[in-house]
Design a protein with these regions (language model features):
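Structured, charged N-terminal subsegments at the starts of enzyme catalytic cores
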Residues: 145-281
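Long, non-catalytic protein-protein interaction scaffolds
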Residues: 1-156
């Protein structure tokens, strides 16, 4: 994240965030658990969590040596990773969302904050939250549908108009992110394909199916229940990677996934197989 922000300091904020997500999705550690049927990870291991320095860093540095001693939400962090965080801290000082939010406080609000009358940490240090995106539309159209609509909208812009110029940054960011999402999914397709070569016959069959699905969704419309759940999970985990995973919901998973469940059941999927996929989710 820090490398990407440094590399794109001259860009508009929305483009810096798009390039950062692109760098993360292409470069982060990925893995497939031994019996997993759905793939996609937010951190480098199960029960781990990434740090989002662009939102806030003061509290991270202040609590760095107490993470493993807290009453709740304990984390163990290596000395090496502690040093990495201390090394990037000077860059983020004054640049985080929290810093910019505090700078925008009216004088009276700042006084109330300093006195402890108001608290802002849950909102001022987080991305978009308490939302459920339109997973159903992605399942129906695939992200290639979003790409096509974005390119069409770009063609209609008049870049001599200031409002259209602002829109152009948004559309550029969409295209960067869509390419990044596709690259992320394809990384899992390649990993599953590679693992299949040394797996048991039964597991190899599962891994090859994972590879096939990851080459398809979320860019293409889903057709099966397995494809639908994998597409939803890719979108859900990437949203958490992009905006620190604060209060994101699946919404009505039962409604938008039911057509794919019904189709797969008619094609021979058993109730036990469907249940196993949901347990993976």
């Amino acid at each position: 994240t820090t490398k990407a922000y440094r590399a794109h300091e001259q860009e508009q904020v929305i483009l810096r965030r798009a390039y950062t997500l692109d760098a993360v999705l292409r470069g982060m550690s990925i893995y497939i658990d031994p019996e997993a049927l759905l793939v996609g990870n937010q951190a480098s291991a199960d029960r781990a969590a990434p740090i989002f320095p662009e939102y806030a860093m003061d509290w991270v540095i202040n609590e760095l040596d107490q993470f493993d001693q807290r009453d709740g939400d304990r984390f163990t962090i290596t000395e090496e990773n502690k040093q990495v965080l201390r090394d990037i801290y000077p860059y983020w000082k004054g640049r985080t969302l929290q810093d910019k939010g505090y700078a925008a406080f009216p004088q009276r609000a700042r006084l109330f904050y300093d006195l402890g009358i108001i608290k802002t940490e849950g909102n001022i240090t987080s991305g978009d939250a308490h939302i459920a995106v339109d997973y159903g539309r992605v399942l129906r159209e695939g992200l290639k549908g979003y790409r096509a609509r974005t390119l069409e909208a770009q063609e209609k812009l008049d870049l001599t108009d200031f409002q259209d110029l602002k829109k152009s940054y948004f559309y550029q960011a969409i295209l960067i992110v869509l390419d990044a999402v596709e690259a992320y999914a394809l990384r899992f397709a390649e990993l599953a394909q590679a693992q299949a070569a040394s797996a048991t016959p039964e597991r190899a069959k599962e891994l090859l199916e994972i590879a096939r699905i990851c080459r398809k969704v979320p860019m293409e419309p889903a057709e099966t229940f397995h494809e639908a759940l994998q597409s939803v999970w890719f979108l859900h985990v990437i949203l958490q990677i992009e905006s620190n995973g604060h209060s994101l919901s699946y919404g009505r998973l039962d409604q938008y996934c039911f057509p794919y469940y019904e189709r797969s059941r008619q094609a021979g999927m058993t109730e036990e197989q469907a249940c196993e996929l949901l347990e993976n989710l």
